[in-house]
Amino acid sequence: MPIKSENRNPPFNITRLSHVVLSSKDLDKTRYFYETGLGLEVTFQDKNNLYLRCLEEPWNHSLIFQKHEGPACCFKIGYRVFDDNDLNKAKDFFDQKEIPCKFSKRQFQGNTIELDDIAGVPLEFCATMDQKEPLMRKFDQHTGGRCAFLDHIQISTHDVQSAFDWYSDLGFRLTEYTAADGTDELWGVWLKRKYNTQDVVYSNGEGPMLHHIALHTPEIANVIHCADAMASLGLAENMDRPPGRHGIGNAFFIYFRDPDGHRVEIFTSHYAFLDSDLMPKRWDLSNTKRSQVWGFPAPKKWFYEGTSFVSKELKAPLLKAAPVTLEDFLEKLS
């Protein structure tokens, strides 16, 4: 199927990824990991909720953790729209499409609407959020990974093509993609609304499942310092994938798993993707440089493990192919 262009006159104006709502069995352990380890700021905590944000974020939160005794899960993926008028347009659009959608309330946010996307991912859109001065210029308080902002998420889905079509209709632009060699059979799509390469990635796999959240830091040295800081805090075993560089997006990265198993990427080096005549970059599925330009492949768990969305049934992927894993790589060396 040909690669379609994004809708340049979308029904409402989504501006960026806003926030992610995740589960936590122990909010104090979660706080230690994100605040003391990664260097995020806590903006609110009570017995059932923990709100955090990164150094450059003037809004109240980009991560919310809710006390939850069941299996680890993701409750919501949040996006920002330009203003409240766009929320009304969104509600009208989804009602017209007969996609269940409702207004709701969340602490520290303005009007919010909830719905599920075509992959079954629970979404919410808001236009406003409480604000206060960020820690950006309080350099003495920059610790851990010195994370600047929540940049993107990656989600595994059983049907990448349908997710791509759905988000393209909402104005998300394709910047890079993975396809089966010699075809446009989509295995992964990197989609954006803000200035750089992605707000959300949909990749082929059992889903819907949140693969990771990604926090941007301005320098490569911060990625390495984050690893050192986590080790000094006794959190070295939380590393999920060691430092390397992705071909797709050009990110220099490290991955951790938080106390509940949610995967977190700390990265730098994405590039701007702005001009209207820029074409998306294609990667063959067989080209392993898309995942790592150098270094070892990811371990098997990196490809198959993730965070389920609450009350959502997992579906087997429509496309089948075994990834090149660290275990496979080491076996060939033996």
Show which residues each predicted segment covers.
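Core segments of cupin and vicinal oxygen chelate
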Residues: 12, 18-59, 104-107, 114, ...
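Short, flexible, glycine/charge-rich loop motifs used to bind or transfer phosphoryl groups or to couple energy/partner
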Residues: 10-11, 67, 143-144, 203-204
